[in-house]
Amino acid sequence: MEENFFKLILITNKQQISVEEYLDFVCACVQSGVTSVQLREKELSYRELLGFGEALKSILDPLEIPLIVSDSVSVCLDLDATGVHLGQTDGDVIEARELLGSDKIIGWNVNTLDQLLNANTLPIDYLGLSAMFATQNKPDATNLWGFSGLEQAVSLCEHPIVAIGGIDESNASKVIDAGAAGIAAIGVFHSAQNPSSVTKALREIVDRGLRC
């Protein structure tokens, strides 16, 4: 698996859009620079989630773009997805690693410094730092890391950090400069009038920052 799969992660938010139309949107973003897609659809049933996941894999697999499943090891296994992104209430990471084996990616979401320090001993591939800034997609976020919090987290963390929450073209450069290995986002992609253009701009920002 390419090490920089977490450079620019598109987190899904299909809502009422048809699957066909949404796949066109995802494909446009992937062709413009998204490096992996995170399946996050909390309103779907297990069966619906599998169906949507299979549809995503049908366009992502030929392009060798990883599909990461939010919250569920079982969905990851049933889809044979590339990996899983787990939150603090989504089960035991060590057990997840035993179930998934060494070939699957595991991301672990943290909201506090204590959680981050604990993550240093866990068998994960990257750490999701959430939320960076205020965002409509995480209205209940009680801790916003901001740039200084991200810098502190990077200095203390043993894993690559993917910054999540409220990131767009206006702040992505500073996020990478503060030490993030990548960014994951919902709103900046889904609210864009031209998703391809926004994706290209974000990818250029990330690539430029990581080269420095």
Swiss-Prot record:
Protein's UniProt name: Thiamine-phosphate synthase
Catalytic activity: 2-[(2R,5Z)-2-carboxy-4-methylthiazol-5(2H)-ylidene]ethyl phosphate + 4-amino-2-methyl-5-(diphosphooxymethyl)pyrimidine + 2 H(+) = thiamine phosphate + CO2 + diphosphate; 2-(2-carboxy-4-methylthiazol-5-yl)ethyl phosphate + 4-amino-2-methyl-5-(diphosphooxymethyl)pyrimidine + 2 H(+) = thiamine phosphate + CO2 + diphosphate; 4-methyl-5-(2-phosphooxyethyl)-thiazole + 4-amino-2-methyl-5-(diphosphooxymethyl)pyrimidine + H(+) = thiamine phosphate + diphosphate
Organism: Chlamydia abortus (strain DSM 27085 / S26/3)
Taxonomy of the source species: Bacteria, Pseudomonadati, Chlamydiota, Chlamydiia, Chlamydiales
GO MF entry, a single one: magnesium ion binding
Keywords for the protein's UniProt record, in alphabetical order: Magnesium, Metal-binding, Thiamine biosynthesis, Transferase
Function summary: Condenses 4-methyl-5-(beta-hydroxyethyl)thiazole monophosphate (THZ-P) and 2-methyl-4-amino-5-hydroxymethyl pyrimidine pyrophosphate (HMP-PP) to form thiamine monophosphate (TMP).
Pfam families hit by this protein: TMP-TENI
A GO cellular component annotation in the UniProt record: cytoplasm
InterPro entries (alphabetical): Aldolase_TIM (IPR013785), ThiamineP_synth_sf (IPR036206), ThiamineP_synth_TenI (IPR022998), TMP_synthase (IPR034291)
